[in-house]
Amino acid sequence: SGSKTANIGDGCFGVPIDHIGSTSGMGCGSPRPKPTPGGS
């Protein structure tokens, strides 16, 4: 829904990568250079 968030973090869960990716590493954009459709 938020192009800004998807553009910057590309969070698979719809959450800002800057937050979850840094803490839990669940962000598909943080741990991986290219987020894979399907999660994990």
Swiss-Prot record:
Positions of the pro-segment in this chain: 1-8
Protein's job: Snake venom natriuretic peptide that targets both NPR1 and NPR2. Exhibits hypotensive and vasodepressor activities.
Chain segments carrying region Disordered: 1-40
Source domain of life: Eukaryota
GO biological process: regulation of blood pressure; vasodilation
Coiled-coil segments on the chain, per record: none
The protein, known as: Natriuretic peptide PpNP-a
Family classification: Belongs to the natriuretic peptide family.
InterPro entries: Natr_peptide, Natr_peptide_CS
Cystines in this chain: 12-28
